[in-house]
């Protein structure tokens, strides 16, 4: 089963008051918008596939899910049987349903106001915020965004996870491959 959701990271032109200590709002850029990180996480291994997009819409979500399913198969996670998502418009429309049909997966919708159902991915977003978005001082959001793929690689291959016995997620996939033989 795969979990899918999006995280909005604000765009910025320079470090903010948390870094500079300056609370003067006169030079602050407003209305720059957000960069959307659409993330897909394998339920068992906790492997994550993520892409940056300008908006969270049905097209971007469907493209990301298709690429994520192919990438997960390459890593050894197997075929997608189900996809867990919230009830945002981009997950309830025809385009997303068509993508699920192409993957041969059923759709599991989270009841309204129950984000704990998607707790594994929500925990990943907490880690993403702490270790990627705010983990260091970025000169601007474009530089931060370029570092996402490196962070995801680190998260999947080297970062210890308590749910995996202190090992990175990729080891759970590799362990499962050894047991299947």
Model-derived features: positions:
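Mobile genetic element proteins and their domesticated derivatives, centered on retroelements
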Residues: 5, 40, 46, 65, ...
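Mobile-element integrase/transposase regions
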Residues: 1-39, 47, 63, 181
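Active-site beta-loop-alpha junctions of metal-dependent nucleic acid enzymes
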Residues: 27-28, 33-34, 51-76
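RNase H-like polynucleotidyl transferase catalytic core
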Residues: 79-87, 101-120, 136-139
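Basic, flexible linker segments flanking DNA-binding modules
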Residues: 1-14, 89, 97-98, 114-115, ...
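Short small-residue beta-strand/loop micro-motif enriched in glycine and branched aliphatics
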Residues: 47-51, 108-110, 134
